Amino acid sequence: MAITFNTDRLQGLEGTTITGVYGRIQSVTVKKYDAETNPSVAVRWRCLYDVVLHASAVKRNASGEYPAWGNRLNSREIDHFTCTYDPTSDSNPYAQAYADLKTKLAAGGSPIASSIADA
């Protein structure tokens, strides 16, 4: 799974719109937060995920199985997110993370990205 999008929020390229950025979720961690310290608060599940960015799918694939850090694009606004995780859902953590990523990239009055699509 991966997505493509356009953005002007890359480090070192601020204000320059880069089209066809290829984003892939590299890792997902699901955490359960117990209500031990405060019994009135229910148990919470959170999903933490890291996003790796490349200039395009072609450039990502050309760099091999494990691309070097030098081949990646950087953006503090796009590289790490958290979301609520639903353990009762039929979808896996990666699917939930991708759905959340698409929503967060397009959200707000000044969205981080545009033309978001599955790759």
Residue positions per predicted region:
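Viral virion structural and adsorption modules
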Residues: 1-46, 52, 56-119
